[in-house]
Amino acid sequence: METPAMFIKRCSRSIFLQVVIGLVIGVICGVGIPDLAVQMKPLGDGFIKLIKMLIALIVFCVVVNGISGAGDLKKVGRIGLKSVIYFEILTTIALVLGLVVAYSLGLGSGANIHLNELPAGDVALYTGRTQEIHGPVAFLMGLIPTSVFSAFAENDILQVLLFSVLFGSALNLVGEQASGVARLINEFSHIVFRIMGMIVRLAPLGVFGAVAFTTARYGVDSLSHLGALVLVFYATCLVFVMAVLGSVLRLSGVRMLPFLRYFREELMIVMGTASSDAVLPQVMRKLEHMGIRSSTVGLVIPTGYSFNLDGFSIYLTLAVVFIAHVTGTPLAMTDLVTILLVSLVTSKGAHGIPGSALVILAATLTAVPAIPVAGLVLVLSVDWFMGIGRALTNLIGNCVATVTIARWENDIDMPRAQAILDGRLEAPAKADGEPLKRSAVAGEGKLHG
């Protein structure tokens, strides 16, 4: 039987247990002493800001190190193209799934809420920002930073990714003459990852602050009005993860449950903070540790954070149909097709916009005249709770995408990956922040199909 001393010792070594404890204490604090709990918000916000502070640098280091040592630049372009095609297929499946589930269940039907009962002021906060969602040309132009420094200063990950790909490609082409620069960036990455390791140790505190504030602010009762929407959303995400992503992962030779267990610490942090940004560096590190080549991880994960938002895609079509039903708006087949086509465009602008879920939901509703935009206010009270499901599904989707594309490219050491997922090889033992050396990532350089 485990003694208290043994449990404390185990907790001191396990970020996962520390995060669970932080989450439980946060709920207790939020319910028991809400006045104090609402003041804990800076702990969660501060933790996420600390993580975001290093994301651009980590993406730069991982991508440059990966591409500069990748050898064949045609392979890098091939990975990028395959990633975009994969993302488009999977997000389309997610959008269709959300649409079909909401429509077939009649989600929200019978509520009989009249438009004049809805407070327009809250809606205006989000509809007034729909101009932030750009068209395809403006989006592509937005990938090009005004300067290298502005990309890093504004923490625009896609702009940083573009510069990193160009910089890494140039290092690759210059070759031996630039070996000193490549070595310097590699050594710099050790420092950045060490800082990240220090920050990750604060995860339990960040989760405690975020959960305590949310429980005190919204309360468990806030789910009661829109419980059906929340439950159907989570059930749909679960079906998508286990059936769709599970099948994709299985085709790559990996089982979903061991895969989820491998990322349990990161999933717990996302559950507490409702932000997948908070674990991006750790996830990239763990995927490399599984045996995936760093250049593949560095290209797929940052791109996926903007183009492969499976959880958000489910939420978008589910919420649009729910609002239509709850306001008594009849939907013809042409309306459903319009919702799907509009969502395919608007869903690609979600990452990087504050309050992006509600802003893009407003943009989608605005583009579908049959549905009243005022219905947006109906999902405001449960948006945070649904945000947890969005972030979890987005994260799992991007991890699965990385494994799948690495498998297509023979960029994964499968014996090593299976050994780690089966528990025969240990996962990174602690958040020490050390980047993984190439030999540790790819089985001394030998990759297996």
Swiss-Prot record:
It comes from the Bacteria. It is found in: Cell inner membrane. Keywords: Cell inner membrane, Cell membrane, Membrane, Symport, Transmembrane, Transmembrane helix, Transport. Its main location: membrane. The keyword Transmembrane helix applies. The keyword Signal does not apply. GO terms for molecular function: fumarate transmembrane transporter activity; malate:proton symporter activity; succinate transmembrane transporter activity. Pfam families: SDF. Gene3D superfamilies: Sodium:dicarboxylate symporter. InterPro entries: C4_dicarb_transport (IPR023954), Na-dicarboxylate_symporter (IPR001991), Na-dicarboxylate_symporter_CS (IPR018107), Na:dicarbo_symporter_sf (IPR036458). GO terms for cellular component: plasma membrane. One of its GO terms (biological process) is L-aspartate transmembrane transport. The chain crosses the membrane at residues 14-34, 47-67, 83-103, 157-177, 195-215, 226-246, 312-332, 359-379, 385-405. It is a multi-pass membrane protein. Responsible for the transport of dicarboxylates such as succinate, fumarate, and malate from the periplasm across the membrane. PANTHER family: AEROBIC C4-DICARBOXYLATE TRANSPORT PROTEIN (PTHR42865:SF1), PROTON/GLUTAMATE-ASPARTATE SYMPORTER (PTHR42865). Belongs to the dicarboxylate/amino acid:cation symporter (DAACS) (TC 2.A.23) family. This is C4-dicarboxylate transport protein 1.
